[in-house]
Amino acid sequence: MHLHEYQAKDLLTAYQLPIPPYHVATSVPEVEAAIQAEQWKAGVVKAQVHAGGRGKNGGVVIAHSPEDLLAAADKLLHMQFSSNQTAGLSLPVNKVLISPLVEIASEYYLAIVIDRKHRCPVIMLSKAGGVDIEEVAEKQPDQLLKMTLPSSGKIYGYQLRRIAKFMEWDQPIADQGNRIIRQLLQCFYEKDASLLEINPLVLTKDGSLVILDAKMTIDDNALYRHPELADCYDPSQENIRDVLAKQLGLSYIALDGTIGCLVNGAGLAMSTLDILKLYGGSAANFLDVGGSASEKQIQEAISLVLSDKSVRVLFIHIFGGIMDCAVVASGLVSAMQGQKETIPTVIRLEGTNVDKGKGMIINAGIPCEFVTSMSEGAELAVQLSR
């Protein structure tokens, strides 16, 4: 689950981390009230969206007067934000964060993230903060320090000394940096985060290290341990089909292909995506209905896939062990009968009640092509998608 910047800052504030004062507003009058309460004469207004690239795409506005602050807030609160990180979506800006300006001497990058290759957290730092870190890593890899962290959630003294040397911090600044890193690590572990990114971490002209921006992602699988974070979920920042899938209890991820997929089992679903790519096609989604889906869930799942206008072909790939092919067939018939238009449909059914399931589909007059293997189905689906 992604957090908004203000939500991440709320969490970090509880860990006594240095963050400039800020207010969150949903309307211009709320912004005006915050400005008057703080007596700010200048500041920054930031769109609260689940996307990077805000600074480059008009989502962050620096204002040098109260009037400019109000104008910036009014502009952002009516914005549909998009960038190269929104996957083609335009995200509504429902809230803005207002904060005073800070006199910056240097900007740094700091992140703690789960490295799936090494199966452990890593910490990454760079003296080139406030920019696209991907660009720095690609063009100037020597400007990025990356270290694996122990599973204990601590960081060793020699690692902190290496960080201070790499970042060229003198002892007073290194002492501040050490405390910030330790507190960030504590937050990362205690909140079951998969990402905690500070960009930028800044050194002010008076010699203080301050967190200006924060991005945080919580592991969905650990949310049951954090009921206090339930209200942080913002469905307005997600693809509507992702939101509906969560409500239906389905494992769905929108992709950018043209072949809609309905599969049972995550392993089979990933294999299906791979073989579609092998034959020159691409999936429009990952959808695992599991082994205990009901007829209603199958119906809703198919309707969900077909609601994506980029889908040209539907590929249903079921290997029924626990899953009953007759239940899948019944859900398919119900879903197709409710569609105004039909698209080419490729079906591979194997396992429990397969003959009964196929008979139900044939008797209902659902136009489709039955196949007997994964490769045959993938090849046909790719052909029909062209």
From Swiss-Prot:
Mg(2+) binds at residues 199, 213. One of its GO terms (molecular function) is magnesium ion binding. Residues 9-244 form the ATP-grasp domain. Keywords: ATP-binding, Ligase, Magnesium, Metal-binding, Nucleotide-binding, Tricarboxylic acid cycle. It catalyses: succinate + ATP + CoA = succinyl-CoA + ADP + phosphate; GTP + succinate + CoA = succinyl-CoA + GDP + phosphate. Substrate binds at residues 264, 321-323. ATP binds at residues 46, 53-55, 102, 107. One of its GO terms (biological process) is succinyl-CoA metabolic process. InterPro entries: ATP-grasp, ATP-grasp_succ-CoA_synth-type, ATP_grasp_subdomain_1, Succ-CoA_synthase_bsu_CS, SUCC_ACL_C, Succ_CoA_ligase-like_bsu, Succinyl-CoA_synth-like. GO terms for cellular component: cytosol; succinate-CoA ligase complex. Its EC number is 6.2.1.5. Pfam families: ATP-grasp_2, Ligase_CoA. Binds 1 Mg(2+) ion per subunit. Its cofactor is Mg(2+). Gene3D superfamilies: ATP-grasp fold, A domain (3.30.1490.20), ATP-grasp fold, B domain (3.30.470.20), Succinyl-CoA synthetase domains (3.40.50.261). Coiled coil: none annotated. SUPFAM superfamilies: Glutathione synthetase ATP-binding domain-like, Succinyl-CoA synthetase domains. It is an enzyme of class 6 (ligase). NCBIfam families: PRK00696.1, sucCoAbeta. This is Succinate--CoA ligase [ADP-forming] subunit beta. It comes from Chlamydia trachomatis serovar L2 (strain ATCC VR-902B / DSM 19102 / 434/Bu). The gene is sucC.
